[in-house]
Amino acid sequence: MYPDRGLLFLRLQATEPTLREESRFNFFITFGGVTPLSEVETFCRTGHDSVLESSVFLVTLHVMITPDDIFRIADGAAFDAAALEIFRRQARECAPYREYLARIGVRTEHVDTPEKIPYLPIELFKTHTVYCGETPPEAVFTSSATTGMTPSRHPMRSLALYERTFRAAFRTFYGEPGQWSLYALLPNYLRRKGSSLVYMADRLIADCGSGGFYLDDCEGLLAAMERDPKPKILLGVSYALWDLAERYAPKLRDTVVMETGGMKGYREEIPKEEFHRILCDAFGVGEIHSEYGMAELTSQAYSQGGNVFRCPGWMRVTARDVNDPFDPLPAGARGGLNIADLASWWSCAFIQTQ
């Protein structure tokens, strides 16, 4: 058996003399008593067609993974295998994704490498319920939307899976939450319902054991941070951090400043490098960290400086031509983003952003 190669040689007893050279079967087997496998296709039978004669079959394994398995992804090969299995399931169970694949003429059985997986346009989260199965979701997260715009909706079947995802990502880049205090300056997110960012920050603040949300009380925020002896993370929406920098220019001690969410129409958009320089000068820090997430995703990517983002092992981001969603670009090129987020287990793990 070669599970790392996805191949398995079986010696089977032929019971029908009419078996052809190219026979195809389905098996449900347990590999090593641990990994459930599904839809094992057999082909390339060798030997002679005779009753009870021992024959050799080469079979391809499609591993049926569980949500637990995505957190054990350790390399690119494991990611590729998991991505293909999740694609096959979501192509069957997620109606908008299934319809999209049909409209663009993609047949599931022809998608045999991750590079061939089509990515669902993110706009469909505004017009369709991107969800697998019939079980009601535990929550529905929504995106920010200006007046007159339709927000995206992301049904979350399992809040436990979402919590496990953001906690695992946080530990990957920042270690155990208990060593930090987390202060959240997220005014526009707190003023509306359905924010996945607020949900995440609330749970991480509880895990840290210190910190909190500050809506408009900037003086209270700065006083609390000044008294706090622990290392601190100040997580703020970009425009709110800029306001804090202009009004108070506080020199923050033992603090990671982490921006997220953009200007949301409250401030002018400026190049990220210039914005980070303004914050560094005002707060007296050497680098600005960033969190990248969105309502349509389950996972987060983090930059720990230099605006270079890193993803957890179950998330992958690639660039594509903005005018051709099926034309990938090389690493380092500028373009639209294709995001594979394997933690989006019950919605769609393959999202095409603008």
Feature map (PLM): residue ranges:
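Internal, well-ordered alpha/beta segment that forms a basic, Gly-enriched binding/recognition surface
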Residues: 147, 162, 166-205
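Active-site diphosphate/adenylate-binding microenvironment
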Residues: 92-142, 148-155, 162-178
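Short, positively charged and aromatic/hydrophobic N-terminal segments
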Residues: 30, 37, 45-50, 56-60
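Short, low-complexity intrinsically disordered segments enriched in A/P/G/S/L with frequent Arg
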Residues: 15-17, 23-24, 34-37, 48-52
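Extreme N-terminal basic, low-complexity initiation segments
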Residues: 2-13
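Active-site glycine/GP-rich loop and adjacent strand/helix microenvironment
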Residues: 62-70, 74-97, 179, 188, ...
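Intrinsic-disorder-associated, low-complexity terminal segments enriched in Asp/Asn/His/Tyr and depleted
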Residues: 2-4, 26, 49
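Generic short N-terminal amphipathic or hydrophobic helices
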Residues: 25-28, 64
